Amino acid sequence: MNPIVKSFEYGQHTVTLETGVIARQADAAVLASMGDTTVLVTVVGKKEAEAGRDFFPLTVNYQEKTYAAGKIPGGFFKREGRPSEDETLIARLIDRPIRPLFPNGFKNEVQVIITVVSVDPQIEPDIISMIGTSAALAISGIPFSGPLGAARVGYINGEYVLNPTVAQIETSQLNLVVAGTASAVLMVESEAQALPEEVMLGSVVYGHDQQQVVINAIAEFKAEAGKPMWDWTAPVQDETLVAQIKELAEAGLGDAYKIQVKQDRYAQVAVVKAATKEALLASNPNIDLREVDNLLGSLEKKVVRGRIIRGEPRIDGREPDMIRALSVLAGVLPRTHGSALFTRGETQALVTCTLGTERDAQKIDSIMGERTNRFMLHYNFPPYSVGETGMVGSPKRREIGHGKLAWRGINAVMPSAEEFPYSVRVVSEITESNGSSSMASVCGTSLALMDAGVPIKTSVAGIAMGLVKEGDDFVVLSDILGDEDHLGDMDFKVAGTRGGITALQMDIKIEGITKEIMEIALQQAYGARVHILNVMDQAIGSHRDDISDHAPRITTIKINPEKIRDVIGKGGAVIRALTEETGTTIELEDDGTVRIASSNGEATKEAIRRIEEITSEVEVGRIYNGKVIRIVDFGAFVNILPGKDGLVHISQISDERVANVSDHLELNQEVAVKVMEVDRQGRVRLSIKEAQTKEAAAE
């Protein structure tokens, strides 16, 4: 075994790429490390494509092994199970920038597997996974227009920080990941604290500039370790068939794309394509219909893009910077804690908000450590939203990714636990879709949170931008349709407030996207965002003054931390009885904070009363009404407060001589007792006769 190793400094860390020792039967295998965080990236591709395949079957699997953090998995089987949400999101993060770097017409199956084998809790594994993937593809011999670089950018005290640690991210106003080639940015994923457009754009440029060291290092690594390039050539188009299809379908497709209603437009496009195939089959019964479909798709793309570049109206008749008609409704469902229906053209989201206690927060145990999410956002995309049938079940990768993007857009304006001690779950049901349903989810979430009485800092809106570029000519499109997303060169989603950007996601399919184009897109997105916010504010401009009657009301009280064990009781008996008998949810913190949650105000008051009884101190000289709980030869034990018992000595039962305690007292008898003493060990001495004397004197 002859390892080939390449090391370089990258920000605060040393990056090492190694090949030639592990997984040598894969087309390429790279052990990539950044500090103590190490991933094994393998690439395998099939030399031949399946006959008739009309898509590129790229699979990216990212898996975190618990042994990487020195942990044993939980559960019965004690092994890793299905991918977590974090694993799914990182797999998508890697997939998005590498996919456009494979050549057009390449249909061979390629599988990339990234395995996290060691992790430093201060260095997240996503950036080194992207770097390792780029290096493995570069040396594999598979056709790939890399290398690709990747960087995380933070913004702390007005300065950009390259690849900040986990601790630094906690104080950063920005968490941005950017990936690209030497000449072009291909992908951006970010979360920000309402930063201005110029700061966000600057972070993208900074990250792309800094990652050139990665690109250069991988190029050197490839020169030393790269395998021979595959003998693959792109399929040659049948120009005669291209001309025939253009003659038969161009005019019809042009007319079809003037129909503004999506379903009607799709129906007419299908008619044009069917007529074209019929005409071609009549002249050549052996024609390859898959090739015809591909060429019709290319012609469709040229027709739509050409109209936009020439300055003609868009598919639905809008100008480039126009937003579709908006409909905004808050409080649309009677029993939910908060709800909203947000409609933009043919895209619609029904969003609900549910409030819960700290116990309802999401507990996550990953290789990076344990964390708790008080704010959850789940995005569902049922098949009926696009007029189709399909499987309904657990969320797919796309749904998880869109939900996380919407979460990032909203998280910056969420209140702290001190301001609002509730767990919050938002669900966005996409009921109609024709472009940018994730941004509709952002708008709907902002509205539903306000309807639920969640004191978010301000309203948030999101917009999806697109781009059509031919040579030096380009047009930036606001509020893109699904077709414009599919046929365009860029998908650029921006969420934010009037004050700045909270989330930015960008996927670019071509090179040549300049800083100036991104600047225009951001400014155009700002105008669109403000327009949407103005409409949203007309429906609900600020959060409700109170939460829903159907939501649990959380009341917070403070007790002496030393009394926590008294409230819990032996084996949890006291707190269990409290919650069952009052119907409330009670949560305790180590500092003595007690949160009581219930939708019934009287139940909350009763729980507070009983907790105060349990935690109150026994006062010497005070008379209590207690209950006899045990009788012994030398006296009786009386319970005066929950968890507080005292001894009435036989000499303190009566002024008369008592020979037998049972002659004067019985179990469960209620008696008035006076506290005579509490000794250093907390033992309480009680007197019945002193209580009677005091009561008689009071009369």
Swiss-Prot record:
Encoding gene, per UniProt annotation: pnp
GO BP annotations, alphabetical order: mRNA catabolic process; RNA processing
Cited Pfam families: KH_1, PNPase, RNase_PH, RNase_PH_C, S1
Domain (KH): residue spans on this chain: 552-611
InterPro entries given in the database record: ExoRNase_PH_dom1, ExoRNase_PH_dom2, ExoRNase_PH_dom2_sf, KH_dom, KH_dom_type_1, KH_dom_type_1_sf, NA-bd_OB-fold, PNPase
GO function term, MF aspect, one: magnesium ion binding
Localization, UniProt: Cytoplasm
Primary location group: cytoplasm
Protein name per Swiss-Prot or TrEMBL: Polyribonucleotide nucleotidyltransferase
Primary role: Involved in mRNA degradation. Catalyzes the phosphorolysis of single-stranded polyribonucleotides processively in the 3'- to 5'-direction.
Cofactors (names): Mg(2+)
Superkingdom of source: Bacteria
